[in-house]
Amino acid sequence: MREVLLSECIDLLYESHFVISKPFGRSCFDLIAKKADLRFLIKILKNIDSLSTEQSEELLNIAKMLQAVPIIIGTRTRNSIMEEGAVYERYGIKAVTFNTFRDQLSGEPPVVYANRGGFFVNIDGAVLRETREKLKISVGELAEISRVSRKTIYKYEQNEANPSAEVAIKIEEYLDVPLIKGINIVDYMEGLKSQKSREEAFEKILKEGEDFKIRVIDILGDMGFNLLETTKAPFDAVAEESKSEDAENQNIIFTNIQETENEEIRRKAMIVDEISKMLNSHSLLVLEKKTNENKQITSMSISELEKIGDTVDLLEFIEKKKKSTK
């Protein structure tokens, strides 16, 4: 079922003129999709409650650094089938069905979101108040019709609370005015958590005994890069020269860090290189010692990395390597 859903999403994204990455296994995301300045990090799950805390944290952190929209596409929750046209949320990440995602890409955003107690909608509180006062309808009258308290109506008008879908429809019908607003699931800034500190990330790496990885990340950090260490992605770290409001102008290096090189490492590095090209970024494989030169991958030994002065020097090194392989 998951494989079918993944295939359908790939077809949909191609039809919608997105450039997409190859699917990943055992990662916090399955696909990266890009069109113009819109980027998606997509996780496909049959049961959206199977997303782990660790996966969600990493997905959010990568999305924030790449200025991308993290989204889960699934079919059910732990207890029930997911409703079409409704937005769910897990660990701050929006989750929808395939059909709801397709409608969003077609310009038809969902209007209902799932929360404890049922399904709710966002309404325009200012329009609600203006219309009620214009029609000379008291708060008490509207509360009685809606079967909620007067206090709740005041909260709706101040945008301090949202009604259930059922209550919103009653209010709309009584006032004869549209109040329900669509939910923008492509707002990448909404709900994104802050990244973990380097100290927290190092603690995890230390527990896993990855001394070589720590050495490389320390060197990159000393150069002046902002760093995000990963354990649930096809790359080991994302190094960012500086934060830019424009995703296209970010100098980002997707970094794989391995003591020894083998066929599996090369395959993963080539996939990461494809991601970097898709996102107008860079990729780098750092090894204990370089073996055979692979012209398709930008790689260097840790001793070479230690000789690099700063972020500018490393980016120039990568650019020079790219040009030499063309």
From Swiss-Prot:
Entry-linked Pfam families: HTH_3
Residues in the DNA-binding region annotation: 139-158
Annotated keywords: DNA-binding, Transcription, Transcription regulation
Disulfide bonds: none
SUPFAM superfamilies: lambda repressor-like DNA-binding domains
Coiled coil: none
PROSITE patterns: HTH_CROC1
Every HTH cro/C1-type domain range: 128-183
GO molecular function terms listed in the Swiss-Prot or TrEMBL record: DNA binding; DNA-binding transcription factor activity
NCBIfam families (alphabetical): PRK04140.1
Protein name, as recorded: Putative HTH-type transcriptional regulatory protein MmarC7_1702
